[in-house]
Amino acid sequence: MIAPGPTLETARLILRPTALEDLDGFATLAGDPESARFIGGVQPRAMAWRAMSAMAGSWALQGFAMFSLLEKSTGRWVGRVGPWMPEGWPGTEVGWGLLRDAWGKGYATEAATAAIDWAFDHLGWTRVIHCIAPENTPSAEVARRLGSKLLGPVKLPPPYDTIAIEAWGQSREEWRARRK
């Protein structure tokens, strides 16, 4: 079963709503110390289930959530990318979290580009942010490649309120001007 929502495609990737079959991927992402370092830290499979369920629930309640990210060539789940704005979040975010073996391939930038286009065109967002830990230089580089600028420190809601986070972002107009 797949949560309600659209499927997006890029040259190499499929972005679709969360499906029950994604649990192994979510658990691998949550269980790897490097992959999970900046997305809440290592979590057991039961917490990966909760995170996956939160994504599916957000699709049902808000009409958006991070997409499950699949390689087109293999159909393999490689991460989650897309719009995210839970209660108390500092803004309309497009975020990403990829399995370690999917790093360095340009997937985060490619998928986030499709997700930002969708958020601006279909959700009517006027601004997008990316919440990034200052020491997460690879994600800061993705934000730069997307055309976002460092906006400054932001506070996330509990239980993440003790983590130093910086917002990167841009307006819909800035995004569209850059995409022409």
Regions found by a protein language model. Name each.
Residues 1-38, 53, 66-180:
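Acyl-donor (CoA/ACP) binding surface of acyl/acetyltransferases
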Residues 44-63:
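Active-site rim helix/loop that mediates acceptor-substrate recognition in acyltransferases
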